[in-house]
Amino acid sequence: MVMKENEMKVVVTGLGVISPVGNSVAEAWENIRNGVSGIGPITKFDASRVDSKVAGEVKNFDIKNYVDFKTSKRMALFTQYAVAASMDAWKDAGLDACESLNKDRVSVML
């Protein structure tokens, strides 16, 4: 493939997962390989008044493993999942230890 002069390369170097099948890349991949479903009865709220009684809920997630309590209280649950997955991807990429990192050249995509 020939790249044009104004095109930039994108490199995926780290992964993070918070999902109904696992809260880490290793756990999610293992469950996917073993055919484990993340779908089950709704437990996060009273589903008696909605048509569907099943969903893919994230289990055993603790935002306090990622941010302090005060910060977590200002985040919606879906934002907590995104922040946690992003932080895991950053760590997986080895960027924690990269002191010479040009932050203008790095991003986390969700």
Tell what function each PLM region has.
Residues 1-110:
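Conserved "HGTGT" condensation-loop signature of ketosynthase/thiolase-family condensing enzymes
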